[in-house]
């Protein structure tokens, strides 16, 4: 033993000093000490280079500690944690640095300081680069220049990032962006059920799975979640004058005449929640920020064994067209798996901590006004699917007796819990009956009182009974936020509710596959035969080219592919294809019942709603629910499974819109798209969660680089916009519409001459193939559709023109009204008459259209041809031919509002 000790020498490298309890160093072999010294020297050289290279790119500092400074000195076969933080009380990966005066959090908006942290030789560095990589990517001149820039910026406290970048340096930074798309892996994660903070901060073992908090023989936490600072996110944006101006959208929107009184609901600010906060003194400064939160979990691999949860923050102060773009979203937290989180409060702790500080106000510099102000931010809503909101709100979930978060309806158990308003006839005396138009709604005060009762329970058994009675498991950490109101701050997600649940269940009912195969309940006059469904699927497939490409994915055979349908395809099935395909095949009562649902969905999809629209939505969903409960449930116990919670939630949709604004503002399409973007980031099978977190952090850095205009423009020059002037056949200076090529001189036929005489006078001129509308749509023509194998029909149009209401009565004074017409564009014509050029469209009109009681428009044949002003074309539609009837498919539900 003595002999072995004598062969060892003292190593005082940073790693060994940290592993020694006294901080002196460790006794190791000479060869190991030599390797440590080389590694430490290499790390110091790389850090000197990279801290300068990337000093202008960070979005915010990383929470760190003295314990985290050894990561770059680990053995070469180990990966490095991009955002590792061993000493963090909550073991949360943050974009903030410890500062004593703010309890361990620091918000620095300096890009230079931030990227120094990111590239320093600490455990929060995000990737492991060897010396050869740096030498290959950065020439000595670039390295010297970066060092000079770093020194000059450090000496100048007023440095604003306005520096001159050489071509070599910009190439190096572009290369860094390319690297951000590569595989950045790190140490392995274990199952994550709780975050170690709050009541868990002193625990050494997880109380759910009993696994150790620390790595073997190291006082280092095994697991970390990623947290990205909301405060830094907002501060950085206000440093850019352009973005600071864009953040006034909320103030501009709410300053319109009649706001809050005109009954218009066009954004989340028209909802009752915002109006209530406004009346209570919130959002007094035009620069105060309104936020929206969203949570969702997804499977990172196809085998669906590894969960990952995302907390997304959306800035409602940005206009709707921009707030949904990737660069304007903030992924506030990544909760790694593989297990789903058991205590969601523990993971929300750092987010709520920052949101509370933002409620009280933080110092922020506004570059637009060149002044420091007190920035307040309040979160208006939290959205998510049912499992997500169940965790967030601390509810017992949709499988419990009190599964509805909006009302106190009690479910009925039959192998599962279901929610009819009328109990089965056999058990009318056992269960309560509810009025669908007057449900017992929950209130914020009721939530708080019930949580108090839970906490006063004398035993676990008593608490469990109260949880079942109330449908609440405990106190959500969201109660710490003043702006949150239970349950009105948690809107219904119509993407999952309508498109992925109800549409699918209705299809199963109509195909006779809803109940188990051994059940005798797969009967009813609403069921269509297999032969009818086969024809429906064939008609959908044959119509694939008859709809404009802007309608989305062409219809797929629903019989063959319904299991692979996504939300958008179910939405298209509901609003565009279902009524024409079911008309004449389904009994009239069922067709009319389903039409109420379809029309309600089409209404809530509108970008802007009126009070009358909301009343109509409430009435239509109520009517559909009554029809559904009567025809499909029939108050029979054996059919109780038809009354799933999703059908009950239809009764709360109108109230949800009134509270938090139109559905598009809060539905889950946005976070589902974010989860889809995160899927390819898990390139590492061994360390997928670190892989995802690393890449997201690099995303955030480049997203925030746009707010440092000079550097962003130098690194990523603006791309020259293509004006397609060569494709322009004709345009007018006072018009937003233009004619697109190809074009040619055209001699009008006799029949065309006759038609144009009716409009103006005879002549010939340039004929165009496409019309670019003011909405940016390119409406084609029959002349343009040359390749019939793949070209889609995008020349069927809706035309709105003024007509004389009394044209059949010449003696009456003309009274012009707007009227809709449908037709197909043969071609466009730039027509010159009396030195004035007109843009005309040669239209093949449909015959008279008919509208049935469900609002479905159809016609039997086409009619005459006519020249019209191209400006009268509003948008394109689809003509869905079924047998001898053409049905008008119109996806643009908002054309009347423009």
Positions of PLM-derived features:
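Terminal interaction-prone segments of large eukaryotic proteins
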Residues: 406-409, 434, 438, 442-447, ...
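Cys/His/Pro-rich metal-binding microdomains
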Residues: 12-14, 207-208, 405
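Acidic, metal-ligating active-site segments
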Residues: 264-337, 409, 580-582, 602-603
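Domain-level detector for long, ordered catalytic/regulatory cores in large eukaryotic signaling
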Residues: 113-125, 134-136, 202-203, 211-270, ...
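Polybasic, low-complexity terminal segments and linkers that are predominantly intrinsically disordered
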Residues: 1-157
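Residues immediately within or flanking Cys/His clusters that coordinate Zn2+
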Residues: 8-10, 203, 401, 840
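Short, flexible, mixed-charge glycine/proline-rich loop motifs
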Residues: 1-7, 185, 194-202, 392-398
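Compact, glycine/acidic-enriched structural inserts
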Residues: 316-364, 703
């Amino acid at each position: 033993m003595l002999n072995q000790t004598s062969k060892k020498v003292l190593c005082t490298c940073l790693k060994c000093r940290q592993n020694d309890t006294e901080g002196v160093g460790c006794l190791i072999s000479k060869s190991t000490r030599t390797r440590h010294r080389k590694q430490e020297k290499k790390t110091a050289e790389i850090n000197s280079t990279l801290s300068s290279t990337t000093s202008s790119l960070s979005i915010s500092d990383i929470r760190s500690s003295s314990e985290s400074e050894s990561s770059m000195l680990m053995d070469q076969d180990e990966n490095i944690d991009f955002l590792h933080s061993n000493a963090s009380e909550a073991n949360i990966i943050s974009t903030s640095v410890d500062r004593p005066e703010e309890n361990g959090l620091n918000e620095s908006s300096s890009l230079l300081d931030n990227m120094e942290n990111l590239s320093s030789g600490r455990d929060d560095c995000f990737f492991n680069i060897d010396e050869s990589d740096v030498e290959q990517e950065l020439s000595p001149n670039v390295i010297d220049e970066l060092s000079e820039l770093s020194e000059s910026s450090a000496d100048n406290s007023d440095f604003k990032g306005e520096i001159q970048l050489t071509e070599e340096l910009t190439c190096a930074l572009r290369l860094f962006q390319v690297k951000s798309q590569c595989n950045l892996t790190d140490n392995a994660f274990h199952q994550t059920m709780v975050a170690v903070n709050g009541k868990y901060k002193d625990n050494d073992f997880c109380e759910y799975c009993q696994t150790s908090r620390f790595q073997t023989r190291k006082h280092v936490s095994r697991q970390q979640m990623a947290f990205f600072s909301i405060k830094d996110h907002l501060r950085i944006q206000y440093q850019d004058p352009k973005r600071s101006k864009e953040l006034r959208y909320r103030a501009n929107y709410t300053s319109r005449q009649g706001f809050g009184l005109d009954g218009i609901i066009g954004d989340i600010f028209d909802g009752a929640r915002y109006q209530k906060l406004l009346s209570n003194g919130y959002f007094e400064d035009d620069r105060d920020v309104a936020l929206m939160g969203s949570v969702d979990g997804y499977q990172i691999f196809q085998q669906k064994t590894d969960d990952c949860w995302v907390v997304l923050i959306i800035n409602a102060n940005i206009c709707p067209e921009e707030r949904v773009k990737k660069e304007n979203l903030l992924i506030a937290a990544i909760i790694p798996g593989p297990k789903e989180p058991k205590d969601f409060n523990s993971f929300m702790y750092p987010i709520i901590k920052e949101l509370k500080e933002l409620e009280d106000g933080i110092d922020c510099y506004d570059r637009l006004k060149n002044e420091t102000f007190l920035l307040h931010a309040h979160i208006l809503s939290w959205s998510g699917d049912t499992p997500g909101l169940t965790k967030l709100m601390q509810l017992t979930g949709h499988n419990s007796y009190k599964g509805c978060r909006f009302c106190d309806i009690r479910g009925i158990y039959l192998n599962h819990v279901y929610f009819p308003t009328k109990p089965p006839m056999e058990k009318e005396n056992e269960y309560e009956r509810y009025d669908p138009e007057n449900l017992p709604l929950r209130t914020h005060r009721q939530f708080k009182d019930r949580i108090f009762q839970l906490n006063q329970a004398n035993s676990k058994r008593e608490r469990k009974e109260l949880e079942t009675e109330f449908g609440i498991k405990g106190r959500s950490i969201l109660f710490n936020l003043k702006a949150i109101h239970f349950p009105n701050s948690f809107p219904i997600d119509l993407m999952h509710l309508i498109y992925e649940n109800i549409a699918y269940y209705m299809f199963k009912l109509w195909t006779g596959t809803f109940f188990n195969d051994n059940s005798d309940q797969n009967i009813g006059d609403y069921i269509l035969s297999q032969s009818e469904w086969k024809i429906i699927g064939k008609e959908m497939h044959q119509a694939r080219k008859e709809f404009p490409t802007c309608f989305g994915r062409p219809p797929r055979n629903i019989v063959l592919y319904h299991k692979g349908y996504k939300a958008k395809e179910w939405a298209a099935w509901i609003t565009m294809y279902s009524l024409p395909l079911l008309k004449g095949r389904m009994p009239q009562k069922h067709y009319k019942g389903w039409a109420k649902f379809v029309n309600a969905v089409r209404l809530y999809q509108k970008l802007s709603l009126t009070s009358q629209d909301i009343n109509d939505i409430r009435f239509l969903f109520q009517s559909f629910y009554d029809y559904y409960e009567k025809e499909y449930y029939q108050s029979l116990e054996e059919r109780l499974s038809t009354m799933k919670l999703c059908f009950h939630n239809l009764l709360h949709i109108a109230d949800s819109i009134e509270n938090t604004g139109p559905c598009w503002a809060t539905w889950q399409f946005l976070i589902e798209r974010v989860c889809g973007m995160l899927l390819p980031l898990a390139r590492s099978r061994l360390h997928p969660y670190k892989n995802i977190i690393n890449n997201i952090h690099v995303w955030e850095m480049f997203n925030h680089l746009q707010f440092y205009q000079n550097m962003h423009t130098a690194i990523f020059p603006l791309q020259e916009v293509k004006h397609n002037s060569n494709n322009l056949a004709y345009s007018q200076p006072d018009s937003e519409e233009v004619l697109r090529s190809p074009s040619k001189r055209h001699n009008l036929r006799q029949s065309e001459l006759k038609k144009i005489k009716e409009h103006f006078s005879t002549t010939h001129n340039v004929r165009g193939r496409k019309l670019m509308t003011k909405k940016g749509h390119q409406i084609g023509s029959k002349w343009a559709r040359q390749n019939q194998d793949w070209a889609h029909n995008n020349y069927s149009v809706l035309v709105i023109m003024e007509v004389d209401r009394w044209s059949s009565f010449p003696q009456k004074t003309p009274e012009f009204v707007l009227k809709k017409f449908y037709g197909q564009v043969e071609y466009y014509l730039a027509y010159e008459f009396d030195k004035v050029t007109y843009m005309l469209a040669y239209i093949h009109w449909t015959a008279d259209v008919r509208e049935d009681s469900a609002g479905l428009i159809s016609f039997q044949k086409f009619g005459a041809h006519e020249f019209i002003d191209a400006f009268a074309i509003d948008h394109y539609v689809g003509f869905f031919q079924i047998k001898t009837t053409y049905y008008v498919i119109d996806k643009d539900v908002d054309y009347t509002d423009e």
